Amino acid sequence: MKKFTQVTGVVAPIDRANVDTDMIIPKQFLKSIKRSGFGPNLFDELRYLDEGQPDADCSKRPINPDFVLNQPRYQGASIMLARRNFGCGSSREHAPWALDDYGFRAVIAPSFADIFFNNCFKNGLLPIVLEEKEVDKLFEETLATEGYQLTVDLERKKVVKPDGTELSFEVDEFRQHCLLKGLDEIGVTLEDRDAIGAYEERRKAEAPWMFLGVQ
C-alpha cells in the first residue's frame, strides 16, 4: 500500500449529496478482482455519454463535457471534495480502488457511508470528515479559483488552504499509523514477525506434538 504523509494537489468538486458506490464504479465493472485498471471507469455514467462496457477503449468514447473530471481546470486532481453521505449504497471495495487508480489520495466530505469509509483506509485512500460549513466554504473557493489546491498533512491532521488557513480533522491513531507507514493488514502483522517467530519456537518446545507434519 502506498504511504500517505502529505499531499498537495488540485481539488475536484463533486457537488451532490448521497453519491453511491454504483455511481462511483458501476456494477458491470466489478468482475475483476485486480485493484488496478478502474480509473478510466470512475463515475462512468456521469463521465461518458454512452453506456460503459468492460474492456471498452475509454479513449474512444464520447465524453460529457459538463462533468467535473472532464474539465481542463480539474485535470490531475488528487483531492476530491464531496457532499454528505459519500460512498453510500452497496458494499464494493472497487469504489476506493477506482478513486485510487484515477489518482485521488484523499476525499473530503461532511460524512461518509461506514463501509466505504473503512474500505478507504484499507486501500491507502484518506477519507476526511470536516464540518459542513467548512466543506461549503471549500466548494465556494474551489469553484471560484481555477487550479485551486489544498495540502493534506496526515501527520498533523490538518487540511491547509492556499492562504495558510488550517482545518483540523480527526483520524484513528492506528489508521493514521498504517497510512503513514503504507501498511495494509498483512503489513501490520509483519511488523511483529519477530515476536510471532519467537512465540512459534516457544510453542514448539512446549507442545511439539502440535507441529507434527508441519514443515
UniProtKB/Swiss-Prot annotation:
The keyword Lyase applies. Heterodimer of LeuC and LeuD. Its EC number is 4.2.1.33. It is an enzyme of class 4 (lyase). One of its GO terms (cellular component) is 3-isopropylmalate dehydratase complex. It comes from Hahella chejuensis (strain KCTC 2396). Keywords: Amino-acid biosynthesis, Branched-chain amino acid biosynthesis, Leucine biosynthesis, Lyase. Belongs to the LeuD family. LeuD type 1 subfamily. One of its GO terms (molecular function) is 3-isopropylmalate dehydratase activity. PANTHER family: 3-ISOPROPYLMALATE DEHYDRATASE SMALL SUBUNIT, 3-ISOPROPYLMALATE DEHYDRATASE SMALL SUBUNIT 2-RELATED-RELATED. Catalyzes the isomerization between 2-isopropylmalate and 3-isopropylmalate, via the formation of 2-isopropylmaleate. CDD domains: IPMI_Swivel (cd01577). It catalyses: (2R,3S)-3-isopropylmalate = (2S)-2-isopropylmalate. One of its GO terms (biological process) is L-leucine biosynthetic process. This is 3-isopropylmalate dehydratase small subunit. Pathway: Amino-acid biosynthesis; L-leucine biosynthesis; L-leucine from 3-methyl-2-oxobutanoate: step 2/4.
